[in-house]
Amino acid sequence: MAHVSFKSKEADSMSRWSKYLSTEESPPSASLSWRAMGVDGPQGSASGQKHLQMEPVVQLSKVAEGLLAKMYRLNSILDYPDPNAHTFSEAFWKAGVMPNFPKICITLSKKFPEHPNKLQLEKVDKFALDALNENAEGYMQNLEQWITLLLDLLEFREQALRLILDLSSTVITLLPHQNSLILHAFMDLFCSFVRVNLFSDKIPRKMILQVYNILHIMLKGGRDCEFYHRLVQFVDLYDPPVKGLHEDLNFVSPRIGEVLEAVGPIIFLSTDTKKLRNEGFLSPFHPRYPDILTNSAHPMRAQDLANVTSYREWVLLGYLVCPDELLRVTSIDVAMVVLKENLVLSLFRDEYILLHENYQLYVLPKVLESKRMAKSGRTKQKEADLEYNVAKQVEKMLMEVHEQALVSADALHHERRILLKQEIGRMVLFFTDQPSLLAPNIQMVFSALALAQCEVVWYFQHVGIASSKSSRGRTVDIDAADPTIGFLLDGMGKLCCLVRKYIAAIKGYALSYLSSCAGRIRFLLGTPGMVALDLDATLKGLFQQVLHCLENIPKPQGENVPAITCDLTDLRKHWLSILMIVTSSRSSVNIRHLEKATVSTGKEGLVSEGNAAYNWSRCVDELEGQLSKHGSLKKLYFYHQHLTTVFRNTMFGPEGRPQHCCAWLGAACCFPECASSIIPEEVNKIGRDSISYVESLIESIMGGLEGLINILDSEGGFGSLEMQLSPEQAAIRLNNATRAKAVSGLLAPGHESYPDNSSSVKMLEAAMQRLTSLCSVLNDMEPICVLNHVFILREYMRDCIIGNFRRRFHSMIRTDSCLQRPSVIESLLRRHLSIIHLAEQHISMDLTEGIREVLLAESFTGPFPNLQVFETPTETHGGGSAIDIISNWYIDNFVKDASRTGVVFDASQNCFRSSQPIGGGYLAEAFTDKRELKALVRLFGGYGVDRLDKLLREHTSALLNCIDSALRSNRDALEGLAGSVNSGDRIERDANLKQIIDIETLADFCIQAGQAITFRRLLVEAVGAVLEEKVPLIYSLLKGLAMQLPEEVPDKNEIIRLRRVASSVGVGDKHDAEWVHSILAEIGSANDNSWTLLPYLCAAFMASNMWSTTAYDVNTGGFSNNLHCLARCVSAVVGGSEYTRMEREHRRSSLSNGHMDELQEPELLSRVSAEANIKSAMQLYVKLSAGLVLDSWNDTSRPYIVPKLIFLDQLCEMSPYLPRSTLEVHIPYTILRSIYHQLYGASLMATEPMEPSPRQSPLISLAHASPSMKQNRADTTPRSHTFEPGYHSSSGSQYDEGYEGDRRTGERQLRSMRRSGPLDYTGTRKVKFVEGSSSGSHGAGSGSLQRFAVSRSGPLSYK
């Protein structure tokens, strides 16, 4: 095994840092110039003097970042231990770095720096020591990289300290306004040196060193590792680190004090918010002198404000490690200003130490010692008094500033955030309106970005910070709902966007400045003072090279500025070379000589011009780097959890602004820059965390967007506006207001809106404003790029709105206990769509298309079987969840009556009724009247109706299969029944009736089938009404097309499809039979001769027990157990089966003959013959049923006869295949008239005993006369079982809104036709009809009805 060896030779001192100086990272722009200096920079002047070498300074600063990153990684692996308190978690021992033997390891750490051999570890834990000895090789390998880290810390300390001492002793001046470039490089290294050593106290250095050494002893026969004693000395010196820093930096302390004093004015300015505002340091125009730009009023101050964050860090770190400098008179104020507004001292990323505790622990004792020395009089009396007073003031300041910071730190920063919010907001507005002034004020923009960056980072650094040693145990209160953070992030984002937008203009302005600068520098070089300096050849050559670079800068002209590519690295390199020479104490010409020689001209000195040229050159080719330095928020990655919390608290809060969300998201773009290339696993981790942060914020943003939409789409939102004033109330108020003499007691218009409602209106306005603002911002936001992930907020917003619409749509469908009424769903849907259309006006995307896709997806379960001929695989069936819910609910509750709520069909109102609410919600009529079904059709369109029709078909097909099975199983009994009817043998007929099995169950099935057919009829009528209303041309086309279809049996496939489409919209009068016919064709039933016995099977229902449990309801015009739906089932199934039988016979004939005789083809293929057969079968059913009813007539069965007679009368009325007078052939109409008279008369007496009934008008006598007298009506056939004066046609005309008017018109016509009473029925009347007709019209042919001459008012015995 190759162990670590220590080499300290100067030759390879920099080669060991190659792993920390990764070329993949983009170094700061300044370091590029420094690194270039290492190759081409001068090694000395003509006299052979040695000048400054700045490349090692910059390299060591980068090395410090690498060392900090490695220590940060070790700290996280070890679960953030506390080595000073010897507190280690369970995860520390399971991390795989240290051996899992806590007793031995903690003992070694506590006894440091004693040698492990002297600790008698076998007495501490003999078993652990033996295990350590056995696996020493593996444990030592685990510690290799971390012991190397300690060696790197040792080497870094030696090299950095040597450089710091060399710079402090050789640099003439370190003032910000003269030598800022070298000053920043020097202070960066100084601060990095301090941070590295302070951070090293957070890792278990003693334990790592001691455990590694004992493992080395075990493996190498008792020898210590070669670097052990030097590392012990190093760790012991820096235990604690501040103590070692005090000793190491004692010699550079005066220079640090000078620097901190020099940056004091800028720090004072940055904390004086009043002066910043009044003097316009962050405003393009001076507040008191609007005719001048502030850039020319105080350019250096505006530029230095960009560095104030660094200056504050210099003060905090400098006075901590150089406490003697606090005893300067001016240092007290500088230190107090910075200490008063901070509680922590940031070390690296989110690692920190408590600021005031460390000052009181390490700085205060030094001050007290100086105070004692001054008091003892070791110095001169006057100086002793001054030093004593200063030390006393510093002592007082350090004792009090902690409490002041706890009280005022957050308030100070909050005030500063408000200032920056205002100034940056104005700056964005100004530069947006006047972009030409952005370039001259670019340094001011950088200053504003830097100050805002500092405030945002400070806010998150201090979240949850608690002071452990405060006398009151207080914590700084950070408001998580502070909206200023969002404003700052938003302002910074907008400023950066402005800079990037006008980067060509800034570049052009900088090039123009540099071009003019060349002339000024040439002039200054030719002044008498410079000539007198007698510069050496090196400096002269460098100045000439600077002039050459400036004079060869391309001239920006017109539109070619963006195309200019200009690399000014050489210019900056040459100027830095000049600075390194003239700032060295070894140079014969220094910076003071240059300033004195050129400042007498009344213009800027040579050094100032050169520094300005240096800064403006960076605006040409390094502008993006500068923008990233001052405006980047990558450090917020380490606080991204706090960032998410504050975002959620401020985004939609009372003072929040939803439009700030883009800035919160944009911060994540720079998060991956935090990853250190020397720790590969960091790249993936930070990338995952960044993506997770963006996804979390997007989830919150979309949740807020949904919340805004749902607030508006609620009863307290737009819903409240719908209920403010009913139309009736509005009409009363308006009518009252227009009258000359208003009715007293009614308020005039304008008083309806109570003052209490104004707040709700304001809430709606605020919600609408936030919604539109958020949509607009998300729509305009650029894509968020995090590593290889791209987040496009428009797409997320569209998905959010569409997804929320889908969820809201599903919630609209159901109430707590029931389905919502379709009309209510439609109203809620329209309200939600109005909100989406409001948002759509601010989005450059088509949301309406997405809404249609959702509605289509919720309605679509497959293509239209009759319109769309393409086939879809069965496995691709999906969607339609909403229509599935509604369809299944309708089938279960109105066709199957699964909830047992007593659902019956009300023929008078053309809807279903129930005796109790369905599911505790509404009655059945609230869901099935024409208005609700039309709303259902409008909601789900043709696909939804098709789904409902498909479920009806499935249910009906199952019932038809049961009928088919019953016909097959009862074929013998039915054939016997047919024979006995033809022979007139009643005994055999009764015997055959008794042999029919499951007649009760079959009757229930047929009633259910009738309910399905009835519901389907209501549905197609609603479809037809909606089509006629919305697309009247298409409806008219279908209606005309249905009348022109060829009368052939069987139809061609295209004709079948057209006929079914027409039937699906309620066109025609026989669509019930057509629908049953299509079902029978699909399931393959009615393929044998057993279906010819269907009339006999249906007639057998007259012997069922269901008649004994039913009652006729005069209000609904139907039976309590829906027996009237059985009539529709019989008519439809007989008709559909006959069409199927004829098609089957046609196919058999085609197969047997090979072809058909052309002369016979028209007769065989005519639908007229099919309808004649249907009519014959229906007449047979009526005849057989009437015979069974009359034959069973006796006193005990009389109550059961009445429902049967009414049922047969209803059948003749509703069937399109039977004339209205069919029943009169078998049963005298006088009987029916008497029955209706008794039922309706009793009902009228019970409901309206005090008023004359309108039903006793002459119209009633006509309504209950023989049907033969009512054939003169052109298009309707009356229903004898109702007393309503209007009637449905046999073709199933609809009961709609115009029905009442038609009823009154018909009533007036009928009154004029007949004035006789209800019993005026003479024997002179004739019944006329044509047997071959399938409609209610009648031709020649008549028969006398002599039995009606002896009719009585009550039912007669029929023999």
UniProtKB/Swiss-Prot annotation:
Binds PIR. Residues 1272-1282, 1300-1310 have a biased composition (Basic and acidic residues). The gene is NAP1. Residues 1267-1359 are annotated as: Disordered. Pfam families: Nckap1. Belongs to the HEM-1/HEM-2 family. Involved in regulation of actin and microtubule organization. Part of a WAVE complex that activates the Arp2/3 complex. GO terms for cellular component: endoplasmic reticulum membrane; nucleus; SCAR complex. This is Probable protein NAP1. InterPro entries: Nck-associated_protein-1 (IPR019137). GO terms for biological process: actin filament organization; cell migration; cell morphogenesis; cell projection assembly; cortical actin cytoskeleton organization; multidimensional cell growth; positive regulation of DNA-templated transcription; trichome morphogenesis.
